[in-house]
Amino acid sequence: MRLDQIEEPEKVQEIKARFFREAESAGRLSHPNIVTIYDAGEQDELGYIAMELVEGQSLKDWSRKPNLLPLPEVVQTLASVADALDYAHQQGIVHRDIKPANIMITKDRLVKVMDFGIAKMASSSRTQTDVVLGTPTYMSPEQIAGKKVDGRADVFALGIVLFELLTGQPPFAADNLSALLFAIAHHPHPEVQTLRPDLPPLLQEIVNRALQKELPQRYRRAGELAQDLRACLHSLAA
């Protein structure tokens, strides 16, 4: 990242702080399903992050028809993502931008969560209230409202990813950004079984619980989501 080419010099420090926050947060994480950050620094006005080289494809490549993954692979993959998020949340870190493009499947079929670029360290004194960060399609209602978020925002985003990988379309869509954000915050998500009648009831329940707008009704931890996904995977193999 060229720090000397930022058009508004007064924003350099803010951008630098956000850039190095990725290294600070992700550098604390050591998990087989999270891309490893090795180093970060600044040299000759160039900010850099050295990270694990991941060769493979992102889930974005398999989020639209006719390229949808087989059902068992979808469930297994997102269970691994949920494991990674549960670990990060236990370290006090919320990803805040979970989406198919940030989930890689390597050539060896390993799942890797990447890009903690807007991750929020729960212990940080810098408030995120009234600051909306993330990719709009995958934002939780509390992110849209600018409220303080925790790991349940990542659970909601992972629920959207699950819906998308199962159906080939996101649960919320609109003609403009304002309408999209309003839909996520206020409209019920479509029932996934209307688009995929072949899905087992347990998987439908998992999608519904992950996409609950009210926090008390949503999965409390990503680990609970991973557990239910593996129970579903077991039932598929039975």
State the predicted function of each range.
Residues 1-190, 233:
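Conserved ATP-binding/catalytic core of the eukaryotic-like protein kinase fold
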Residues 198-211:
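Conserved C-terminal C-lobe helix
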Residues 214-215:
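Short helix/strand-capping hinge loops at secondary-structure junctions
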Residues 218:
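Conserved HRD-motif arginine in the catalytic loop of eukaryotic-like protein kinases
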Residues 229:
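Hydrophobic "lid"/C-terminal helical patch
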